[in-house]
């Protein structure tokens, strides 16, 4: 009957949607797990912890800054990330694969992510922002931020990696073609973080974009 066929079609649609969601979720989880794991590995590296503990006495040494630069550059090249960075909690100096980049002064909009993360209590977080480092052309980037603690548990720095959002958008476009569905990464507020059309730096409400405000 029509109703039986209709109900069967609904079940099939739900099954396909569920499989698509699971497949996309698995792939995205796999993609995001690696940069988180790499960032956590650096956060627990005794060499990096020692370098941060020695910053006060060695900061002016050219060799000190070069050691940090080489360390971060090695991770960038090995894992092909767009950015690898380190921030000292004692000086707020921001280092990346090119060396000392800048100081993250409190009260400046582009540094809010850093102070919010320190105050959050989270061991790691993901945020989307412009890459402010020299030569990055302000590209929209997904950053992983991880706390670095000394032996007593005191936070002495933040380390992490960055992945260009265009790369993630490209993956979502591939998934949309493969599964014939629209894909979005949204936060707890219902705002679109990344999709094939949005880069996360624009504020877009998923419910409004999809005319689903009554859900």
Language-model features: locations:
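Juxtamembrane extracytoplasmic/periplasmic/luminal helical "stalk" adjacent to the first N-terminal
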Residues: 1-57
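Generic recognition of well-ordered alpha-helical segments
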Residues: 19-26, 37, 70, 112, ...
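Short hydrophobic alpha-helical segments used for membrane anchoring or interfacial signaling
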Residues: 44, 84-92, 182-190
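Amphipathic coiled-coil signal-relay and dimerization helices
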Residues: 49-52, 87-99, 190-197
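Solvent-exposed, extracytoplasmic
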Residues: 65-78, 154, 158-202, 210-213
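Extracytoplasmic/periplasmic ligand-binding sensor regions of membrane-associated signaling proteins
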Residues: 77-80, 88-164, 168-170, 174
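Short loop/turn microsegments at loop-to-beta-strand junctions
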Residues: 82-83, 143-144, 180-182
């Amino acid at each position: 009957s029509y109703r039986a066929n209709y109900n069967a079609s609904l079940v099939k649609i739900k099954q396909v949607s569920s499989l698509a969601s699971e497949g996309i979720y698995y792939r995205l989880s796999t993609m995001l797990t690696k940069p988180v794991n790499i960032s956590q590995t650096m956060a627990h590296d005794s060499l990096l912890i020692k370098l941060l503990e020695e910053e006060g006495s060695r900061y002016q040494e050219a060799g000190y800054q070069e050691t940090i630069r080489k360390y971060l550059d090695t991770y960038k090249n090995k894992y092909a990330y767009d950015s690898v960075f380190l921030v000292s909690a004692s000086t707020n100096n921001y280092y990346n694969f090119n060396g000392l980049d800048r100081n993250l002064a409190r009260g400046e909009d582009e540094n809010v992510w850093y102070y919010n993360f320190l105050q959050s209590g989270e061991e790691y977080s993901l945020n989307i922002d412009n890459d402010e480092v020299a030569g990055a052309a302000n590209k929209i980037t997904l950053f992983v931020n991880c706390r670095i603690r000394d032996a007593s548990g005191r936070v002495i720095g933040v380390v992490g990696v960055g992945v260009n959002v265009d790369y993630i958008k490209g993956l979502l476009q591939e998934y949309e073609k493969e599964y014939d569905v629209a894909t979005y990464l949204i936060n707890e507020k219902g705002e679109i973080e990344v999709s094939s059309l949005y880069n996360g730096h624009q504020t877009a409400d998923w419910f409004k974009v999809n005319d689903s405000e009554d859900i």
